[in-house]
Amino acid sequence: MAMNDNNYVIFKVNDLYCALSCLEVQEIIRDTKHITQIPQSDDSVSGVINIRGKIVTVINLPKHFNLDFNKSGTDSIIVVNDDNECIGLYVSEVIDVIDVNDIEIEHTPAVPHQLDPHFVKGVMEFEKEITAVLNLPEILNVETAETE
């Protein structure tokens, strides 16, 4: 599938269905065993991982969203690019890549109750599940995260 601005990666953060535009995603890493923890780092930072010689910080999205962290056998890291810096997002499971028309995304949504409204830019439906389209710049914004 050729990636375009209508493609979204669907994934779970615990039991929450979430989505990111494929234009924001660099790659998906399914092997999470090689994360090196950083002593005295923020609770929402899982650690760092070496990706082809590049050190990437990994943010634990359940902890970042103030949710319980339940490790599963399907955990993955979604690597995103933020201002030419790679950041890994630790998620519970990557489910699919789908094509979505803009009209399918409600941009003034009622946000799933577990998520801070700043982290969500819209909602859509995926397999009858309300799916939060995440606002990546806000998730990666340190100031927003510190005020939560």
Language-model features, listed with the residues they occupy:
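An acidic, low-aromatic, low-complexity terminal/linker signal
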Residues: 1-148
